Regions:
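Positively charged, low-complexity terminal tracts
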Residues: 1-103
């Protein structure tokens, strides 16, 4: 599945900035629950962006069994504060815009 040509399927994207001694931009979007796996059309997007002085590294690789793996490494106390706030905001935002799961 090539996801990046399907970002528009996530609907409206929501963005926020988190800053202390650095600024971390976070963007999320989802078209909510679609009744199953990726073949059913559900898409969720999350992006972290260094907007100012964020010690941020990311790596996409294959795990031990060929599965996808995403690693994010941040350096510094301010970055720790920012990622905590960013992840909390991202989870709350995704939860609020996702339609209820189907029974």
């Amino acid at each position: 599945m090539s996801v990046f040509n399907e970002i528009e399927k996530c609907g409206e994207l929501h963005s926020s900035e988190f800053g202390f001694f650095n600024v971390l931009g976070t963007t999320v979007g989802t078209n909510g629950y679609q009744g199953g796996d990726a073949g059913h059309g559900g898409r969720t997007y999350i992006c972290f962006e260094d907007l100012a002085n964020t010690a941020l590294e990311a790596r996409v690789s294959k795990g031990e069994y060929g599965n996808s793996k995403v690693e994010i490494l941040l350096g510094g106390d301010s970055e720790l504060d920012c990622i905590i706030e960013s992840l909390r905001w991202a989870a709350d935002t995704l939860e609020s815009i996702a339609n209820p799961p189907r029974e």
